[in-house]
UniProtKB/Swiss-Prot annotation:
This is Glycerol kinase. Keywords: ATP-binding, Glycerol metabolism, Kinase, Nucleotide-binding, Transferase. Pathway: Polyol metabolism; glycerol degradation via glycerol kinase pathway; sn-glycerol 3-phosphate from glycerol: step 1/1. Its EC number is 2.7.1.30. ADP binds at T12, R16, T266, G310, G411, N415. Inhibited by fructose 1,6-bisphosphate (FBP). SUPFAM superfamilies: Actin-like ATPase domain. The keyword Kinase applies. It catalyses: glycerol + ATP = sn-glycerol 3-phosphate + ADP + H(+). HAMAP family: Glycerol_kin. GO terms for molecular function: ATP binding; glycerol kinase activity. CDD domains: ASKHA_NBD_FGGY_GK. ATP binds at T12, T13, S14, T266, G310, Q314, G411.
Length: 501
């Protein structure tokens, strides 16, 4: 009987394969990085062939390290960087162009032109998303318009489009020899082409971006047996697909409305389960699909993205030289009792949710002769917590549903000082799970549920365990004063970049 599940975690900088047992414990993993390609300023690309080669390699390496054979796997799940666009030839399996990565801004002008007629929110009621080059639709439109012969191939079904999950599934299940062309609802919801109401491609959106329906994958559930892998693990069921942030929500077992997680990395991604109906946002958030289990209604989510959190620590290290390694920031921040009145607003390229101010720029404010390196370090950590509070308060306003606690994952959660301050400024507990790889775990859970390796969502909840829990310690007046100072600092960051300057 199979006693493990494998998860492919295909991220922006690397690809991993992680093997989990029935308790959700990691048995083994393997990882390979891939090249970041920057053809022009603002352009970011990946080589889809390199990503597939790396995926193939880490699957074999990870399984070998676990001491298992393919027949020991009950299923394979996939989680992936979202929005990144791939276009390939179904006959040869060759990409028609390098993948255009979610960070890429080459379509800013075309998106701005669309926004002039109806504003950036003109399609939010259908897709849940503001108009932005971030999402896949404008990237696919660019590929069809700029790659020779691409539009004709798309119209006759010779060319196939997908986000990275689609590319991997197609190759895993045979490629040119009968490979499946599918994507799940979470990834489809990030293209700006899917209706949140029907969970199908929206004809009006296809018309706006001039996308032939023949090029698009079939939209499937996040947890369902899609088929069997052929290479490198013949016969192993492919049972689940989730975009990376939705996978983290699933891995944190946030299955009920009002349950939320925040992933702390270079930036932060906070998601809140809002239940079986989409919740429109008037507070600067994105409405998206959280997941859909096979044969059941979908769960929806509100999402808030924060551009700069962990990257601020890197900036202290690399640009200012205040620390020699990122791990040193906690010790430096603990060298002072508080922030000394100092605030850092990391608006290096504007502010994301909930403000969405392109004209904001970073600032350090509140400096006096008393302030020292420790105060600046502490203010940098606190900036992450303040921004997270802004997003969670927006979620509560939009949904009308209180968030009782925040489940935290990602690299920054090793910083106990940050986690304590997060609890303090939120006035609610923050929790770090024992299994830190929640994104890959979410993909494994989705796949294992589909094949019966785990029977119910309650089985997954039983697996979830707390590594550490932080409760708020500061008084209400101190909390109010700290956040008021942050709010004043944020306001002063606005308007620094003048229009047409």
């Amino acid at each position: 009987m199979p006693d493990a599940v494998g998860a492919i975690d295909q991220g922006t900088t690397s690809t991993r394969f992680i093997v989990f047992d029935r308790r959700g414990t990691i048995l083994a993993q393997a990882q390979r990085e891939h090249e970041q390609i920057f053809p022009r300023p603002g352009w970011v690309e990946h080589d889809p062939r390199e990503i597939w080669r790396n995926t193939h390699a880490v699957m074999r390496e990870g399984l070998a390290r676990a001491g298992l054979a393919p027949e020991d796997l009950a299923a394979i799940g996939i989680t992936n960087q979202r929005e990144t666009a791939v276009l390939w030839d179904r006959r040869t399996g060759e990409p028609l162009h390098d993948a255009i990565v979610w960070q890429d801004t080459r379509t800013d002008r075309s998106v701005a032109a669309l926004a002039r007629d109806g504003g950036r929110d003109r399609f939010r009621a259908v897709t849940g998303l503001p108009l932005a080059s971030y999402f896949s639709a404008s990237k696919l439109a660019w590929l069809l318009d700029h790659v020779e012969g691409a539009r004709a191939k798309a119209e006759d079904g010779t060319a196939l489009f997908g986000t990275i999950d689609s590319w991997l599934v197609w190759n895993l299940t045979g490629g040119p020899d009968g490979g499946l062309h599918v994507t799940d609802v979470t990834n489809a919801s990030r293209t700006q082409l899917m209706s949140l109401a029907t969970l199908d491609w929206d004809e009006a959106m296809l018309g706006v971006f001039r996308i032939p329906r023949a090029v698009l994958p079939t939209i499937v559930s996040s947890s369902a047996v899609l088929g069997e892998a052929r290479d490198p693990f013949p016969g192993v069921p492919l049972g689940g697909i989730l975009g990376d942030q939705q996978a983290a929500l699933f891995g944190q077992t946030c299955f009920s409305a009002g349950e939320a997680k925040n992933t702390y990395g270079t930036g932060c991604f906070a998601l809140m389960n809002t239940g079986p109906a989409p919740v429109a946002s008037s507070a600067g958030l994105i409405t998206t699909v959280a997941y859909r289990l096979d044969g059941r209604p979908p769960a929806y989510a509100l999402e808030g993205s924060i551009a700069i959190t962990g990257a601020l620590v890197q900036w202290l290290r690399d640009n200012l030289g205040l620390i020699g390694a990122s791990s040193e920031i906690e010790g430096l921040a603990r060298s002072v009792e508080d922030n000394g009145g100092v605030y850092v607003v990391p608006a290096f390229s504007g502010l994301y949710a909930p403000h969405w101010r392109d004209d904001a720029r970073g600032l350090i404010i509140g400096l006096t002769r008393y302030a020292n390196r420790g105060h600046i370090a502490r203010a940098c950590l606190e900036a992450t917590a303040y921004q997270t509070r802004e997003v969670l308060e927006a979620m509560e306003r939009d949904s009308g549903c209180p968030i009782a606690e925040l489940r935290c994952d990602g690299g920054m959660t090793v910083n106990d000082l940050l986690m304590q301050f997060q609890a303090d400024i939120l006035d609610r507990p923050t929790l770090r799970p024992k299994v830190s790889e929640t994104t890959a775990l979410g993909a494994a859970y989705a796949a294992g549920l589909a094949t019966g390796f785990w029977k119910t969502l309650e089985d997954l909840r039983d697996n979830w365990a707390v590594d550490k829990r932080w409760h708020p310690h500061i008084q209400a007046e101190e909390r109010r004063a700290l956040f008021a100072g942050w709010s004043r600092a944020v306001e002063r960051s606005f308007g620094w970049v003048e229009e047409n300057a």
